Structures are given as structure tokens and as C-alpha cells.
């Protein structure tokens, strides 16, 4: 181990930065955040330093570096573009046994600055020992995606509960299980972020008083349209905390590869016109797993509340008293249109968007007259098998036969395929495509030739 990672208490302690430019400013922000009593020495300063000094946040010493500035310091940073000066600051600090960081010169420094993930009071520091700062930054970005934004507030709140938890739970095992539940409780994190004292109290009492081994929950997560990069940050966090993941055919393999490795996976394989597992059975799977005390993620393609039957599944849970939450996803209409170069709205062509199910059930006739109106974009989900009927009905109700249309297959995936034409060709075009596909109808489709970016990558 080349460096010992430590966390320094700098509040109200004297620290020195030599340098008055942009790099020095970045270092100053960190020391100010840590509560240091900061002095900055340079021949000239960028405006931010002057603003901080005017606000009484730090002291500026304009002029050449003088070693006496180090006399009361606990820590120093040399952040100038003058290598000789940086070396001089480092040597002066070394002679006084003061730790000194030298920017971009780790060999001349007695400590290095890590990449920091701040979820105060939780702090994570990542360092490559100065050999590869870019790698450290990339690792920090990865870790940022895994740590919920409100985790720091939950950690701080946990500190306030320690005494009560110790009284409530007799064994270390019970306390550990309680803390595990608390730190993954999404409702508590959101309540703390909103400073909702009533919800904080209710959730805390529920967590403390419920049986530790018999309380499960379900999180309904939208997986997005296909590309794993379009899964939301919160969605990623949920699938990596799950005990059980119940998922559909429309959830891509790339996204399933992100699921926690030891989570149970239950495939319910829903597809247009055919359900491998009946909806009622899916509802019962969610209920049964949650009643075992497990954290269940119901993972759905797109957004779970847009033609995903998410509401039906949650009603079952609600009736059984199972706690649940929802993480929205990028719906297929948004993802497929963006990756096909088709804006859903445009000032010149469409002032509204209609999202329509292509399951045209008997007795559930659509309002074709309104759908055939100009200045809007129609997006049909699961409409491939009904494309000829959609074409016929829209033309019968006045939509021009030359209206541009597009069908997007496997939208946002590397296997995405798009075919376009006119409304009079829709039924014929649909025969060339496979599910899952989305039908887009409107003048905005005409912009595809100009705005199509994804097929060029």
C-alpha cells in the first residue's frame, strides 16, 4: 500500500493554498466545504477568491510566497503553474512536518487528493495513487451511480436512532437486519429529502415495530425502451438491491446483466397477444414473494404506467397491505422516436402527442375522428398486428393517405430497425417488421431523413 487513506478533521484549523487560479479554486472549494480556516497566497487572484474574501470565508495574502505562512498550518496545497515555486512550498512544508499536496506532481507531495463521493456524513474516496487520475474519476462516476443521492441524509438520521435501536433490538443480528431495512427504504429517504416530518415519523415507527423477518415490499421499475444506458439511476439502484426480480420479455439482456447476482429471477414473458404467465398469476407472484419478507422488483420494459398494467399489479399489493413504490422509466414512444430522429412534437407540425394501445378490443372502438386530425403525432404501442386496420380507420376518417408513418423495431437497441413510408403503405410495411415494434404517424416523421443520428453511429 503506497498511501494510507485517512479522513482529516480540518474544521477551524489553519490551512494554506499557494496559487490564485482555477486549479487553486477547485482545491479551495474542498477545504472550505471541510470547514478549514483558509489562507490563500498568490500574486493575483481570479474573481471567485475575491468574492470569498469579501464574504469573510477566507483570507487573501497577495504577494510572493513566504515560508512563515506555514507556521500555524495543519495542511498545505501548492497549486501554481510554477514548478519551482510548488517545489519550494513542498520543501518548506516538509521541514515543518506539514502535509503538502502538490498539484499534478504526486512524487513531490506528501499527500494526494482522491476523487470524492460526498454523501455526508458518508464519504467515499477513490485514488489511483496519482498514477491515473482519469481512472479514479471513472471509478468515482461508477460509484456515484450506485449510491442514492439521499443516502447521506439517511446515514445522518440513522445516527439519531442508534440509542433507540439498541434498546428495541436485543441482539446484534436483529440490529443489523433493522439497519439493512432502513438504508434501502425508499420512502424514508424521500421523506428525509423533503423534510416531511410526519412521513419520517410514520415510516420510522413502521420499520421499528414491524416483525423483522416478515415485512417485504415491491418496487415497480421501468427498464426503459431497451438500451441499458437509458435505465434510470434510481432504477439501477433498485435492481441491485433486489432479492427477487420479476421481469418481462421486453427487458433487455444488457439490463438483466445489471441485476444483483444473487437475486432470484422470475421470468413472466409477456408479449403482445400472448401472456406466458396470466396477469393474475403475476400479481400473486409479487404478493407471495413480498409476504416472505423479500424486496421484490417488478421490472417492466418502458414505463410501468404506460400500457404496462402496473396499476393493476399495485392494486393487488395495496389491497393486501404490501408497501410499494414506483420508479418511472423512459417510455418506448420517447426512446424510439429519439433514436429514430423523429421529434414527437414540433412547432410547425405537431402540438400534441397521442399514446395509443394497438390492442383494438371488440366494443372498445377508438375515437378515430379525433385521431385523424392534423397537427398531432400518433404513437401506437403493440399495433403491428392491427396496422392494416389502423390504416383503414384513419383514412376513412379523413387522414391524408400521404401522411408520413414509421415503424420502429427493437427501438434504442443495437438491433434497431426503422422503416418509413406513407399511411397508405402502413399495412404492407408492418408485414416486414417483427415485435416489439412501435408505429409513429404524423408530419414529424418527415424530419427523419434530416435528424436521424442513431443509424449513423
UniProtKB/Swiss-Prot annotation:
Active site: 248 (proton acceptor), 270 (proton donor)
Precorrin-2 dehydrogenase /sirohydrochlorin ferrochelatase: annotated segments: 1-204
A GO molecular function held by the record: NAD binding
Residue positions binding NAD(+): 22-23, 43-44
Binding site for S-adenosyl-L-methionine: 225, 301-303, 306, 331-332, 382, 411
Keywords tagged on the record: Cobalamin biosynthesis, Lyase, Methyltransferase, Multifunctional enzyme, NAD, Oxidoreductase, Phosphoprotein, Porphyrin biosynthesis, S-adenosyl-L-methionine, Transferase
Family annotation (SUPFAM superfamilies): NAD(P)-binding Rossmann-fold domains (SSF51735), Siroheme synthase middle domains-like (SSF75615), Tetrapyrrole methylase (SSF53790)
Pathway stated in the Swiss-Prot or TrEMBL entry: Cofactor biosynthesis; adenosylcobalamin biosynthesis; precorrin-2 from uroporphyrinogen III: step 1/1; Cofactor biosynthesis; adenosylcobalamin biosynthesis; sirohydrochlorin from precorrin-2: step 1/1; Porphyrin-containing compound metabolism; siroheme biosynthesis; precorrin-2 from uroporphyrinogen III: step 1/1; Porphyrin-containing compound metabolism; siroheme biosynthesis; siroheme from sirohydrochlorin: step 1/1
GO biological process: cobalamin biosynthetic process; methylation; siroheme biosynthetic process
InterPro entries, sorted: 4pyrrol_Mease, 4pyrrol_Methylase_sf, 4pyrrole_Mease_sub1, 4pyrrole_Mease_sub2, CobA/CysG_C, NAD(P)-bd_dom_sf, Siro_Cobalamin_biosynth, Sirohaem_synt_dimer_dom_sf
Entry EC no(s): 2.1.1.107, 1.3.1.76, 4.99.1.4
Modified positions (Phosphoserine) in chain numbering: 128
Family designation: In the N-terminal section; belongs to the precorrin-2 dehydrogenase / sirohydrochlorin ferrochelatase family.
HAMAP family (UniProt xref): Siroheme_synth (MF_01646)
Function field: Then it catalyzes the NAD-dependent ring dehydrogenation of precorrin-2 to yield sirohydrochlorin. Finally, it catalyzes the ferrochelation of sirohydrochlorin to yield siroheme.
Protein name from the UniProt record: Siroheme synthase
Natural source organism: Escherichia coli O7:K1 (strain IAI39 / ExPEC)
Amino acid at each position: 500500500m503506497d498511501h494510507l487513506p485517512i479522513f482529516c478533521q480540518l474544521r477551524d484549523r489553519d490551512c494554506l493554498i499557494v496559487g490564485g487560479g482555477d486549479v487553486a479554486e477547485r482545491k479551495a472549494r474542498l477545504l472550505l466545504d471541510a470547514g478549514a480556516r483558509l489562507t490563500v497566497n498568490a500574486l493575483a487572484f481570479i474573481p471567485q477568491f475575491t468574492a470569498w474574501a469579501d464574504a469573510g470565508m477566507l483570507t487573501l495574502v497577495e504577494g510572493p510566497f513566504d515560508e512563515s505562512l506555514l507556521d500555524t498550518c495543519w495542511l498545505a496545497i501548492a497549486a501554481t503553474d510554477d514548478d519551482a515555486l510548488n517545489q519550494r512550498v513542498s520543501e518548506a512544508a516538509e521541514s515543518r512536518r506539514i502535509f503538502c499536496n502538490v498539484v499534478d506532481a504526486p512524487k513531490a507531495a506528501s499527500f494526494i487528493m482522491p476523487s470524492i463521493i460526498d454523501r455526508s456524513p458518508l464519504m467515499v474516496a477513490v485514488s489511483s495513487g496519482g498514477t491515473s487520475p482519469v481512472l479514479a474519476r471513472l471509478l468515482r462516476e461508477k460509484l456515484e451511480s450506485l449510491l442514492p443521492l439521499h443516502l447521506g441524509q439517511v446515514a445522518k438520521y440513522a445516527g439519531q436512532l442508534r440509542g433507540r435501536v439498541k434498546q428495541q433490538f436485543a441482539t446484534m443480528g436483529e440490529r443489523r437486519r433493522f439497519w439493512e431495512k432502513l438504508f434501502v427504504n425508499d420512502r424514508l429517504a424521500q421523506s428525509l429529502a423533503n423534510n416531511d416530518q410526519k412521513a419520517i415519523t410514520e415510516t420510522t415507527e413502521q420499520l421499528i415495530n414491524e416483525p423483522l423477518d416478515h415485512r417485504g415490499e415491491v418496487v415497480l421499475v421501468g427498464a426503459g425502451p431497451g438500451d441499458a444506458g437509458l435505465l434510470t439511476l434510481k432504477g439501477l439502484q433498485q435492481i441491485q438491491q433486489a432479492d427477487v426480480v420479476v421481469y418481462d420479455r421486453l427487458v433487455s439482456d444488457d439490463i438483466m446483466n445489471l441485476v444483483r447476482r444473487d437475486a432470484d429471477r422470475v421470468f413472466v414473458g409477456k408479449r403482445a397477444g400472448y401472456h406466458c404467465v396470466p396477469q393474475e398469476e403475476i400479481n400473486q407472484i409479487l404478493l407471495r414473494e413480498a409476504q416472505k419478507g423479500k424486496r421484490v422488483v417488478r421490472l417492466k420494459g418502458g414505463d410501468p404506467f404506460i400500457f404496462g398494467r402496473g396499476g393493476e399489479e399495485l392494486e393487488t399489493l395495496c389491497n393486501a397491505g404490501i408497501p410499494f413504490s414506483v420508479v418511472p422509466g423512459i417510455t418506448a414512444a420517447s426512446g424510439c422516436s429519439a433514436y429514430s430522429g423523429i421529434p414527437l412534437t414540433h412547432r410547425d407540425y405537431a402540438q400534441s402527442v397521442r399514446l395509443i394501445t394497438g390492442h383494438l378490443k371488440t366494443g372498445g372502438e377508438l375515437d378515430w375522428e379525433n385521431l385523424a386530425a392534423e397537427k398531432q403525432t400518433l404513437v401506437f404501442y403493440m399495433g403491428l398486428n392491427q396496422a392494416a386496420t389502423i390504416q383503414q380507420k384513419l383514412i376513412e376518417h379523413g387522414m391524408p393517405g400521404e401522411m408520413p408513418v414509421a415503424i420502429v423495431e427493437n427501438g434504442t437497441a443495437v438491433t434497431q430497425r426503422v422503416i418509413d413510408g406513407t399511411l397508405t403503405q402502413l399495412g404492407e410495411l408492418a408485414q416486414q417488421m417483427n415485435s416489439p415494434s412501435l408505429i409513429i404517424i404524423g408530419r414529424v416523421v418527415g424530419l427523419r431523413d434530416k435528424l436521424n443520428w442513431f443509424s449513423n453511429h
